[in-house]
């Protein structure tokens, strides 16, 4: 994989910049932490070299100064809101986050329930945390929020909220997902800190959009693609341009809310420390891009992946809004991209046509070589492509059988005769297990198996929608999958995922 981002430079520069921001205030900074902290795979895809846990590693450099406060909305507890990427409710995700933070040595100070209203589910959640030794605090709905600034910044507004007791200079405010009330929690704390004579500060940490690269840079367009369902729009920050004469990039929601936030700062502290939403940020990612073209190309590919994902979700669920698809089509046009222009798509379709329209899969290796797989009597197309790619990486002739038919057929019998399956062909996870068994006595199979790490970052395209098993295996291997929004059996009404 070509590297476009210096991760070591980022860790050092980002942690130092946050230290500097702490010092600008009364040695107390509330840092609103947006995006994914443990597993930012989007950033790792568009900034090759950025590690998925880079933000966590950066925080670990500040762990002696930092404590974590997790916020969750009472509304999300009552509604049992689900975090899509993990398939668990927000309240359970709070417990997962606590374990994850504590597991790496970060101090979790407390949990704050925002938009608090008395409800059995909320009280049970608080009791569960308290029984586990985790302190909880309550923040309430404020009439007129966010526009009635005078009421919000008063004893009847922020003053009604619990003051979250914290111990360390850096307080990281994070949440299971968006809309949890991170910014409001930070500003409420500033109100209470100033009441106590502590001139604390606020800053915002988000990786995207990157403020100091062009508005239409593919990295920033890829962020818009990732948030197409939210209809976030990257914009030139007009406040920064007016204050400094410098063009920077921010996104619409931060720009729209800035006058309100600025007015709150003035009421809390007497004057605002910031002249623009860009000023509020602490993101240093743009300074760590070391090969712009590598990041541009990676981001173009990400935009295409997001477009295919949207089409597939619409096919599977029928719940995708047309506005999301239109937004992604617009971004494709802005980036000069077209469906079918990638070699991996072209080769997959060519292989399908050559086999009478049967499903086919193609994998593009890191050197640009494209390997295909067809649907056969023993393997599905995606499993076939996987084995063929491993052969190519290991320098093994394609005609070599790494797993014998005699080894595969009993597995097919198990699937169809005993486990109630209808498709006898092996999925990717099944062929990998079979390959692992063969590797014990077959040196070529062992050589192929050892190439699995080299599939990380490879693009894969399937001419049909894949099962959840095949999709999950590709994800665990770190491969970047796209599919045509077509079922293998289009006439069926129900399709198992």
Give residue ranges: language-model regions:
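Flexible phosphate-sensing "switch/lid" loops adjacent to ATP/NTP-binding sites
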Residues: 1-173, 189-351, 355-358, 365-367, ...
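The conserved Walker
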Residues: 177-178
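Transmembrane alpha-helical segments and their cytosolic interface motifs
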Residues: 182, 360-362
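Hydrophobic positions on the alpha1 helix immediately C-terminal to the Walker A/P-loop
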Residues: 185
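Short clusters of small/polar residues that mark proteolytic maturation junctions
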Residues: 374-375
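A short, polar/charged loop-to-alpha-helix boundary motif
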Residues: 378-394
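Short HxH-centered metal-ligating active-site micro-motif
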Residues: 392-424
């Amino acid at each position: 994989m070509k590297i476009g981002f210096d991760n070591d430079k980022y860790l050092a520069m980002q942690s130092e910049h946050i230290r500097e921001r702490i010092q600008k205030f009364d040695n107390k900074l509330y840092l609103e932490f947006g995006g994914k902290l443990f597993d930012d795979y989007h950033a790792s895809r568009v900034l090759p070299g950025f590690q998925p846990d880079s933000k966590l590693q950066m925080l670990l450099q500040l762990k002696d100064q930092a404590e974590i406060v997790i916020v969750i909305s009472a509304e999300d507890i009552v509604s049992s809101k689900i975090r899509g990427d993990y398939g668990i409710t927000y309240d359970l995700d709070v417990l997962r986050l606590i374990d994850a933070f504590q597991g790496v040595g970060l101090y979790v100070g407390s949990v704050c329930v925002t938009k608090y209203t008395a409800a059995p589910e909320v009280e049970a959640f608080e009791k569960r945390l308290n029984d586990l030794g985790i302190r909880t605090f309550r923040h309430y709905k404020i009439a007129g929020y966010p526009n009635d600034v005078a009421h919000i910044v008063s004893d009847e507004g922020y003053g009604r909220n619990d003051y979250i007791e914290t111990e360390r200079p850096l307080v990281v405010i994070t949440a299971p997902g968006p809309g949890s009330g991170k910014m409001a929690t930070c500003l409420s704390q500033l109100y209470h800190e100033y009441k106590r004579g502590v001139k604390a500060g606020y800053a915002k940490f988000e990786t995207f959009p990157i403020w100091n690269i062009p508005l239409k840079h593919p990295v920033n367009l890829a962020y818009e693609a990732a948030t197409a369902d939210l209809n976030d729009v990257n914009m030139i920050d007009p406040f920064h341009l007016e204050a400094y004469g410098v063009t920077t990039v921010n996104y619409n929601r931060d720009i729209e809310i800035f006058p309100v936030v600025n007015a709150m700062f003035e009421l809390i502290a007497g004057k605002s420390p910031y002249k623009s939403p860009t000023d509020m940020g602490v993101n240093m990612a743009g300074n760590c891009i070391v090969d712009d073209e590598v990041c541009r190309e990676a981001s173009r590919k990400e935009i295409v992946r997001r477009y295919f994902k949207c089409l597939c979700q619409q096919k599977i669920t029928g719940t995708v809004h047309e506005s999301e698809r239109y937004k992604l089509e617009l971004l494709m046009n802005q980036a000069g991209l077209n469906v079918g222009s990638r070699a991996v798509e072209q080769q997959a379709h060519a292989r399908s046509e050559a086999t009478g329209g049967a499903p086919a899969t193609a994998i593009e290796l890191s050197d640009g070589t494209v390997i295909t797989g067809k649907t056969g009597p023993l393997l599905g197309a995606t499993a076939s492509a996987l084995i063929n790619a491993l052969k190519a990486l290991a320098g093994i002739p394609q005609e070599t059988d790494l797993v014998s038919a005699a080894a595969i057929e009993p597995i097919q019998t198990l699937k169809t005769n005993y486990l109630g399956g209808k498709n006898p062909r092996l999925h990717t996870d099944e062929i990998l297990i079979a390959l692992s068994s063969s590797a014990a006595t077959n040196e070529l199979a062992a050589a192929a198996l050892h190439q699995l790490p080299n599939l990380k970052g490879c693009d894969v395209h399937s001419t049909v929608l894949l099962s959840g098993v095949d999709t999950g295996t590709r994800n665990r291997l770190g491969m970047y999958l796209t599919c045509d929004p077509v079922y293998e059996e289009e006439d069926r009404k129900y399709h198992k995922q």
